[in-house]
Each structure stands twice: as structure tokens, then as C-alpha cells.
UniProtKB/Swiss-Prot annotation:
It catalyses: 5-methylsulfanyl-2,3-dioxopentyl phosphate + H2O = 1,2-dihydroxy-5-(methylsulfanyl)pent-1-en-3-one + phosphate. CDD domains: HAD_EP. Its EC number is 3.1.3.77. This is Enolase-phosphatase E1.
Length: 229
């Protein structure tokens, strides 16, 4: 029996175009000025220190760090430091009402229904935990943060690595065969399945003929009875 559901965001709960056409450009446009002004702030200094370690350049100055971050954005690198800094910048955008977190129409209602059935809900995304909370806290459907019991990002590992799902199961404290992972990327689902999880693939756009996972187009098409242990 499924006791907890862990969901991805991009392409799963939310249109990937919101991330790539709204969030990413918003942070990119403001990144350099923001870092020059706030590099000494504690919440900014910490990811910059992590970035120096990632680059193996402990003496890198702010301009070198800015250049590296733009390179990471061009490469779509899943850098934990970059994701943290983007999340800080996005926070002001959400709070100022510049945008709201996109959700597919059925997502909020189905998440609420699952919670009412007694399931625990979690998020696992390559975006920082801060960014995840902002998207759901300032979503099209209002503040959905009370629906979730926890959030995971790349601090637990990369999404295509089996160890990441073992880590999450350990932190949640629920057996792998009672966990369901929702994602649009079959390689991520492969890793979760290898860790003993149940899996379901969201097909929001193009079909994925390479996948070996159950597929649905919407959250309200997911039948938890099909995932009995």
C-alpha cells in the first residue's frame, strides 16, 4: 500500500516552460547586480562559498563567480550553489507579485485529496528547497505548502542516481515499497525503481516510448490501487 508520494516539479506538477521562460530569465537578468550588492549577506555568502569549492577556486572573486554562474546557466548545470542563489532572487519576484507558481489545473485538488486520504506528500526537485517552497507557496492555486510534509533537492543526490532515493526513503522513514515517485523523466523513475520504489510517469506533452513505467497524463488519472505492494 502506498503511504507517501514524492513528486517532481518541472513537467510533472508544473509546465516546464514556466521554469525556462519565466523563472530562469528572471534570475539571469538580475543575478550579477544582485550578487554585487549582496555578496556579504549571510544567505548569499554561504552558496558563494560552496560555489568556490565546486570550482576548486577558494580565492575566486565575485566577478569570477558571476562568470561561472552564467556559464552554469548556459550549460543547465544542476549546481546546488546556483539553484540556491536563483531561489533567493525568485523569492523577491514571488513576493512582489511579478509571477505566480504555475501548476497544471488538476494538481492542487489531487494533492489535497491524497493528503485527506492520509498520505504523506513530498517534493523532490533539482531546484532548491527554497525555490520549491516558493513555487507552491505562491502558486496559481494559492499557498499549498501545508499539503507537504517535506522537500528534497540535490543535497540528497542527483535525480538519476539510485542512492538519492535510498536517502530520501531513509529520511522519510517509510519503506521503499510504500513510496510512489512521480516524474516526467523515465531515467529518474528508473533510479527510483532500482531503489525499490513504485513509479508513475506523467506524460504532459510528447509520448515517451522508451519508458518502462506506468504512464498517465494527469494526476487525477493515478490509481493508487495499482501500486499495491
Amino acid at each position: 500500500m502506498i503511504r507517501a508520494i514524492v513528486t517532481d516539479i518541472e513537467g510533472t506538477t508544473s509546465d516546464i516552460r514556466f521554469v525556462h521562460q519565466v523563472l530562469f530569465p528572471y534570475a539571469r537578468e538580475r543575478l550579477a547586480t544582485f550578487l554585487r550588492l549582496h555578496a556579504e549577506d549571510a544567505e548569499v555568502a554561504a552558496p558563494l562559498t560552496a560555489l568556490r569549492q565546486e570550482l576548486d577556486q577558494p580565492q575566486a572573486d565575485i566577478e569570477q563567480l558571476i562568470a561561472a554562474l552564467y556559464r552554469f546557466m548556459d550549460e543547465d548545470r544542476k549546481s546546488t550553489a546556483l539553484k540556491a542563489l536563483q531561489g533567493i532572487i525568485w523569492r523577491s519576484g514571488y513576493q512582489n507579485g511579478d509571477f505566480r507558481g504555475h501548476l497544471y489545473p488538476e494538481v492542487a485538488g489531487q494533492l489535497a485529496a491524497w493528503q485527506q486520504q492520509g498520505l504523506k506528500l513530498y517534493v523532490y526537485s533539482s531546484g532548491s528547497v527554497e525555490a520549491q517552497k516558493l513555487l507552491f507557496g505562491y502558486s496559481d492555486a494559492g499557498d499549498l505548502q501545508p499539503l507537504f510534509s517535506g522537500y528534497f533537492d540535490t543535497h540528497v543526490g542527483a535525480k538519476r542516481e539510485t542512492a538519492s532515493y535510498l536517502n530520501i526513503a531513509g529520511k522519510i522513514g517509510i519503506a521503499a515499497d510504500e513510496l510512489l515517485f512521480l516524474s516526467d523523466i523515465h531515467q529518474e523513475l528508473d533510479a527510483a525503481r532500482a531503489a525499490g520504489w513504485h513509479t508513475c510517469q506523467l506524460i504532459r506533452d510528447e509520448a515517451d516510448s522508451q519508458s518502462q513505467h506506468p504512464q498517465v497524463n494527469r494526476f487525477d488519472q493515478i490509481d493508487l490501487g495499482e501500486f499495491a505492494s
